[in-house]
């Protein structure tokens, strides 16, 4: 084998031995990025054994100076880690791994859900044509094409294009006036 070919093979072998391409499973260990750039640290056993990565850059669908989509994983979550140009010193987290049975409710082919680890929920429901905000302690706001409903405990407020109803019709406000249940009192027409 010629000397040039041997050197080329040696360099290629060294490059392959020190560079890691593709995606690797990782576990988040830190999200407190001191530079506030959505970076994380993770354990990546297949590549780093027991060591923790350096700060992994975020690969986000929308980001810029002072704007973007920010959804950091929680410490302990599974993430996909890759390395820029295969360099172990330049990790990138490119997404999260959904654990078995881990998809949040509600579920459906045309239902998009964002749920925080604290239970705050945003539901974009194309099947029922509504948007819902849900607080883990019970508050709920549902916006549909023809109705908006706010619930908190035993209280409920419904608003349609023609009326506002409190507590299942106990109080109604319409363009004609205000009425109490069973017309006990009316103001207006």
What do the predicted segments below correspond to?
Residues 1-9, 13, 70-78, 83-189:
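Right-handed beta-helix
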Residues 11-17, 27, 61-65:
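Asp/Glu-centered strand-loop micro-motifs enriched in Gly/Pro and often flanked by an aromatic residue
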Residues 20-34:
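Structural detector for short beta-strands of small beta-barrel domains
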Residues 35-43:
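Short aromatic-glycine-enriched beta-strand elements
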Residues 43-49, 53, 76-80:
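Catalytic cores of peptidoglycan-degrading enzymes
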Residues 49-70:
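Beta-strand/loop nucleic-acid-binding surfaces
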């Amino acid at each position: 084998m010629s000397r040039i070919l041997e050197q080329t093979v040696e360099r290629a072998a060294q490059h392959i031995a020190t560079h890691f391409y593709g995606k690797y499973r990782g576990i988040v260990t830190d999200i407190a990025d001191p530079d506030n750039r959505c970076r994380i640290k993770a354990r990546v056993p297949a590549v780093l054994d027991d060591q923790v990565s350096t700060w992994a850059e975020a690969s986000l669908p929308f980001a810029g100076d002072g704007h973007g989509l920010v959804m950091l994983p929680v410490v302990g979550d599974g993430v996909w880690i890759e390395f820029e140009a295969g360099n172990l010193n330049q990790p990138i987290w490119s997404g999260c791994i959904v654990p078995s049975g881990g998809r949040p409710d509600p579920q459906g082919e045309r239902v998009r859900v964002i749920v925080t680890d604290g239970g705050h929920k945003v539901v974009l429901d194309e099947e029922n044509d509504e948007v819902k905000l849900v607080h883990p302690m019970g508050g709920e706001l549902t916006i549909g094409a023809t109705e908006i409903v706010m619930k908190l405990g035993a209280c409920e407020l419904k608003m349609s294009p023609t009326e506002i109803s409190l507590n299942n019709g106990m109080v109604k406000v319409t363009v004609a006036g205000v009425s109490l249940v069973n017309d006990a009192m009316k103001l207006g027409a």
